[in-house]
């Protein structure tokens, strides 16, 4: 009789454990299913895939850097360039479409070098020299990648020692990052990229 009671006790414990595991597995399955549904609703309802979101962050950080150069704030420009570098590192090349990937591979090293160079100095003149090169490569990238809104490709004929220089802006209004308040409105929109 004692053996029977012990066997029954062990059997009850095993059944309890089995039921507990089933409940845990069911709850985990429900949670995982909910997470999958959430990911699908985030990725597809917006119409933007993860790679596009990462590139949008890159462009947004470029625009923030440009705004600090407009303000002639070398300290803040260096900080924004660090953000740009960090966002460049987060782009997953294998998630880019073929055309974007081709351009990304062509410009990525130079874009990263320019961003790191701007981040490494607080000298506004040095930052602006690097921004000329950075803007050329970012233009190549924005031409093939989608951004959330229109991008304005702007040009100042006096920048870059009179050779002229371009930059990208989210605003149609010209705010010159190469001269800041000295010649804030110097330049024009030469292309609208949608």
Predicted regions and their residues:
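Intrinsically disordered, low-complexity terminal tails/loops enriched in metal-binding residues
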Residues: 2-7, 19-194
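Structured mid-domain segments that build the active-site/substrate or prosthetic-cofactor binding neighborhood
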Residues: 9-11
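Hydrophobic h-region of N-terminal signal peptides that target proteins for export
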Residues: 13-19
């Amino acid at each position: 009789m004692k053996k029977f009671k012990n066997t029954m006790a062990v059997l009850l414990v095993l059944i309890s454990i089995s039921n507990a595991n089933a409940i845990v597995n069911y709850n985990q399955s429900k949670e995982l299913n909910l997470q999958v549904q959430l990911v699908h609703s985030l990725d597809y309802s917006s119409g933007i895939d993860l790679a596009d979101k990462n590139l949008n962050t890159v462009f947004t950080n470029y625009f923030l850097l440009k705004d600090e150069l407009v303000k002639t704030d070398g300290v803040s420009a260096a900080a924004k360039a660090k953000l740009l570098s960090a966002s460049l590192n987060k782009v997953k090349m294998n998630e880019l479409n073929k055309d974007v990937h081709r351009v990304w591979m062509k410009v990525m090293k130079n874009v990263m070098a320019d961003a790191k160079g701007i981040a490494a100095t607080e000298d506004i003149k040095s930052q602006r020299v690097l921004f000329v090169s950075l803007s050329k490569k970012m233009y190549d990238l924005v031409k093939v990648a989608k951004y959330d809104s229109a991008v304005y490709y702007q040009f100042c004929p006096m920048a870059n020692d009179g050779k002229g220089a371009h930059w990208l802006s989210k605003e149609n209004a010209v705010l010159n990052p190469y001269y800041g308040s000295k010649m804030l409105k110097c330049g024009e929109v030469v292309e609208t990229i949608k």
